[in-house]
Amino acid sequence: MGNNLMQTDLSVWGMYQHADIVVKCVMIGLILASVVTWAIFFSKSVEFFNQKRRLKREQQLLAEARSLNQANDIAADFGSKSLSLHLLNEAQNELELSEGSDDNEGIKERTSFRLERRVAAVGRQMGRGNGYLATIGAISPFVGLFGTVWGIMNSFIGIAQTQTTNLAVVAPGIAEALLATAIGLVAAIPAVVIYNVFARQIGGFKAMLGDVAAQVLLLQSRDLDLEASAAAHPVRVAQKLRAG
C-alpha cells in the first residue's frame, strides 16, 4: 500500500491531471476568478492612488480662492479630467441657468443638489469592479465545494468498482476533490479582503470630494451674499471700497 501511495503523484499538478473533467473545469474557473481578482486589485490600486493624490493637491490650491471666479482661474490648470473642475463647472452652470433670479437660496439648493449628484456619480465610477470582487468572494467557496462533492462521489464510485477500501485507491481521489475546495478558498479570501479595502477607500475618497464640493458651495454662497449686499447697500459698499 505504501508503495502504491508513493507511486501516485500527489502534487498539485499531479492531482489536477488525474482529476475528473468536471473537477478540472471547476479548478480552471476558480483560477481564472483569482486572476480577475488580482487584476482588479492592481488596476484599482493605481487608480485610487493617483486620484487621491491629485484631489488632495487640488483641494489645497482651491483653499486659497476667495471667490468662485478665482477658483475657476486656479482650476483652469487642473486639466479636463479634474474632478474639482467638474464641480466648479456644475456651480458655474447653475449660476448661468439661474441668471436673473433673485432667489439666492434656490440657487444654492440647486447647486448643492448638482454637487451631490456629481459626487455620487464619481463614487459609482470608482466602485466599478467591486461587484466582481463581491461575486467572486461569495460564490467561490461554494463552487469549490461543488468540485469537492463531485470528486468524492467519483471516489466512492471507484471504491465500489474496485471493491476495495485500500487507502491507495481512496486517498488520491479524495485529495483531488479537496484541492477544489482549497482553490475556492484561495480565490474567495483575497476577493473579500480586497473588496472591503476598496469599499473603505471609496468612502474616504468620496468624503474628500465632498469637502471640495462644500468648498465650492461656500464660494458660491459668499459671492451671492456679497452681490445681494451690494445691491441692497450700494452707497455703503462704495464707501468701503473707497476706504480700502
From Swiss-Prot:
Induction entry: Induced 2.4-fold by hydroxyurea.
Cytoplasmic side: 40-127, 195-244
Segments on the Periplasmic face: 1-15, 156-161
Subcellular location: Cell inner membrane
Cross-referenced InterPro entries: ExbB/TolQ_transport (IPR050790), MotA_ExbB_proton_chnl (IPR002898), TonB_ExbB_1 (IPR014164)
Keywords, ordered alphabetically: Bacteriocin transport, Cell inner membrane, Cell membrane, Membrane, Protein transport, Transmembrane, Transmembrane helix, Transport
Molecular-function annotations in GO: energy transducer activity; identical protein binding; transmembrane transporter activity
GO biological process: one example: intracellular iron ion homeostasis
Example of a GO cellular component annotation carried by this entry: cell outer membrane
Transmembrane segments: 16-39, 128-155, 162-194
Function recorded in the entry: Involved in the TonB-dependent energy-dependent transport of various receptor-bound substrates. Protects ExbD from proteolytic degradation and functionally stabilizes TonB.
Assembly notes: The accessory proteins ExbB and ExbD seem to form a complex with TonB.
Protein's UniProt name: Biopolymer transport protein ExbB
Species: Escherichia coli (strain K12)
